[in-house]
Amino acid sequence: LSILLSLLVPAHTTRSPDCGGILTPSGLRYLAEVSKPHAESVLRRDLMAPPAPAPSPASPSSRNQIISVKVDKFSLTLIPDTGMRLSIEVDLGITSAPSATKEMRLSILADLHVDMNPEGNLELVTSDCKPTLEEVQSTEESDRSAPHKSSGLDMDKQINVEKICLEVSKLLLFPNERLMSLAAPFPITPSCQVQYLPLAAPMYSEQGIIISLQTTFQVAGTVIPLPVSPVPFSMPEPASSSPSHLILAFSEHFYTSLFSALEESGALNVSLLSSLTTATLAERITQMGSLFQEDLPVVLQTVTRSSPHVVLEEDKAIVKLFLTAQIGAGSALFQSFLSVNVDVAARLHLSVADTRMIISVAAIEDVELSLATSDVGPIMAALLEELFLPTIREEVPAQINKVLRQGVFLPHIASFTYTDVNITIHKDYVLIPCNLQLEARTG
């Protein structure tokens, strides 16, 4: 694995990437493909003047009028270490007299790159643009075979190729407003949000456009401090050219930070309803009988006693939770009689729906229970497990899955979603190759 993302960011104690992505050459081709109809619409609007009132015979204004605009070629290619090249060829149909028409070809060659502005937002910048205008054929010419440079200045003035070059980036479907949407905050739970912040302008390699991101989490609108990863995340370079449009990568530290944010928001503090009652417990723990006069359902109220931790191995993701369960009874007035430390190691299942990563607890792999405090005398470890392990094994995954049921938004730009997703879990990181899909417009 070669280090790509770490090259983007100087060593810094507070700004360190924990995820990122590579937009591949095939992804660029897809963006060009879906931008082509958009570009044709924009050029048609800009170049074709609205129908004007019928001019007088003496008026020269009817001499040249663009009557059709068709984008014949629209391509985006990668220029390693530099940026992207946008190549456009547009066929124009022009009337130069009531019965005479001619076709011209407008060719645009523009070099683009994504920069980071002083506000920290990514923006598309045009570094070079070369427009040319050629006459292809005319009804007034006998030889229509070969295109040649147009010598008429009228069309140059009417088309205003310089203005087209100044605004060439708007011909793409991801203008700066959409690039800025990459860094928008996304909800995880009602009180917890995630935000992906670009750390630097992207890099350009033969594999694609590489961007490094730092994740921040907000709880109740405030960014929470999270431990910085001791090892800066490095984007793994694909072994070969990937057929996927985009490859997202997330470090082990990202997942640990996510669960730490959920802990900070209180989302992991849950109540687990047991199938036990105070009467059934009294049959096994004799001192229970003197505490409760009526038969009440037993509840386990769990709180985190230290930060969770996620471990990524080949084909396996494990979250380790360190909880304390207050075991008690009473709905209106909860009365605790036991406190148990619960250490859980649970396997995570990862999938993607639209632009969200769905994280769920697939199975609990290991649970350790130890008595912390007791108001009903000493209790053997074996009895603790017999009484409470079934509830913990069933309810802890159910409650965490309930917290994460909405999923965690992936880095994405507005109007695009992800398809053909293939998630692979490796030691220390997760790779998500996927394809882009332009969402259908509604309304």
Placement of each model-derived feature along the sequence:
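Alpha-helical bundle protein-protein interaction modules that mediate dimerization/oligomerization
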Residues: T95-A97, K102-E103, N117-T132
